Amino acid sequence: MPDEKLPQYNEVWNDLEKGCLHSCPSYSVNNHVNNPIVKQNSTLTQPSLRKKNTMAAPARLRKRSENVRLTQARYAIFHIFLPFILTLLLYHNFYNYFDQALADLNSVVKYVIETIVLIFTYVMTVIIVYFSFSLIKLAFEEAYVYAPSVAKANEGLAKAIAGLAKYVAKAIQGLAHIILSLLLFILGLEVIEQDEETGDVEMSSMRGQAITTEPASDNTMAEETDCNTSKDVESGSN
């Protein structure tokens, strides 16, 4: 109904009643949109009431996440996986390639080199495990990006998937920390075992030297007694 306090609104109302909002030359759509009363309540001028493009944001996020994954994959290939493979080859063929080279070195130096290679191998293993879990975590965290398109803009399902992904990501992160702790524990055990083996080798080498020196002394004593007896026999015959 027309309102006496709002003359501009009354003008629009009259035009609407006449049915000449778009046809009357005295009034145009621009005047209708620029009207302060209509502008305040119009869906054309309020951004919050406009039709939102629901596919723009997920597509942009998907593209950004794909770029992030490509960058991480390249970093993993050139900075993690290739050095790890080379380290494994070095570690498994360590004695074959470097046994002769390290034969003349001190046992302490050899033990230090072996320990460094072992620690580096386990560090690279931990990095690969943690990186793999990080990729899985990233995939679960990005589930909410794909949820609207899969659920056809069903907000309930999207929130459920996002919440589940959040807890799964936390669980994966905790599992990665547990694996890291176990690997470090195994590393400590192997270092201790390697130290014991080097100690046993040193003790066995010392025992071998002692065993080889004792028969030599017995032989020299036997030779001396034989020489003395032969001298006595010669003197008696004379």
From Swiss-Prot:
Residues 200-238 are annotated as: Disordered. The keyword Transmembrane applies. Residues 229-238 have a biased composition (Basic and acidic residues). Residues 206-220 have a biased composition (Polar residues). The chain crosses the membrane at residues 75-95, 116-136, 172-192. Keywords: Membrane, Transmembrane, Transmembrane helix. The keyword Electron transport does not apply. One of its GO terms (cellular component) is membrane. It is found in: Membrane. Its main location: membrane. It comes from the Eukaryota. It is a multi-pass membrane protein. This is Uncharacterized membrane protein C1682.06.
